[in-house]
């Protein structure tokens, strides 16, 4: 099903076609390519806002305790500044991970499959033919961005550790590949829906046809609104 290839991240410039492990075969059409938004990855995957808030609370607590114990505002400031520097480095590393994840990831939708090129140091390419995708779910944010979650057939499985962070959170037993943090999710959702339907037998197209499919319900599955 989902064959994958390995390469080192610095070899992306040697790709025969951007975001793909090989040039598309004759007759296969490229419909869409995109990458995650760096800021959304930082906030949603690496939880930068929550971590920053946690660090801020720790700093406030440390300042209050040192000032209470020593009675010196200067000592409290010095003690807190050292901790603040360490916390800033930690937040910077999280931001760097988000940046590298965004820059090394390319999602591709063709008329035959979805291809995910992911990985910072070790690059992996996953080919997901439409015949092996059971359904998909659109998770749209209020700003028009969002995620596309792909549900593979039960017999097909990609290890969660290989997919992360491009996997639906906490679906460990049956990992679901996820096109994350897309800036404008409606376009790839509509293209995915159309391509998936076109790849299905005529009886399946009729079963899931009018009414069940749309930008808000790609690949015949429900639509979840996220903030």
Place the predicted regions along the sequence by residue.
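Residue-level signature of catalytic and energy-coupling elements of molecular machines
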Residues: 32, 114, 188
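Short, charged cytosolic
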Residues: 3-34
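Soluble periplasmic/extracytoplasmic beta-strand elements of cell-envelope proteins
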Residues: 31-33, 108, 149
């Amino acid at each position: 099903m989902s064959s994958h290839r390995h390469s080192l991240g610095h070899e992306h410039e040697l790709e025969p076609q951007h975001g793909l492990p090989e040039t598309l075969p004759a007759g296969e059409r490229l419909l869409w390519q995109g990458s995650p938004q760096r800021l959304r990855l930082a906030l949603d995957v690496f939880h930068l806002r929550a971590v920053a808030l946690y660090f801020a609370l720790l700093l406030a607590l440390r300042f209050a305790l040192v000032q209470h114990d020593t009675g010196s505002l200067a000592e409290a400031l010095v003690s807190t500044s050292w901790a603040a520097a360490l916390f800033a480095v930690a937040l910077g590393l999280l931001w760097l991970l988000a940046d590298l994840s965004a820059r090394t990831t390319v999602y591709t939708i063709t008329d035959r499959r979805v291809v995910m090129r992911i990985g910072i140091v070790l690059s992996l390419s996953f080919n997901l033919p439409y015949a092996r995708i059971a359904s998909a779910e659109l998770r749209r944010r209020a700003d028009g961005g969002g995620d596309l979650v792909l549900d593979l057939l039960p017999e097909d499985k990609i290890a969660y550790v290989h997919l992360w962070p491009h996997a639906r959170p906490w679906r460990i037993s049956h990992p679901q590949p996820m096109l994350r943090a897309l800036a404008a999710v409606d376009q790839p959702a509509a293209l995915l829906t159309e391509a998936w339907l076109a790849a299905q037998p005529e009886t399946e197209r009729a079963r899931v046809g009018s009414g069940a499919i749309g930008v808000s319900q790609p690949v015949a599955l429900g639509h979840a609104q996220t903030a």
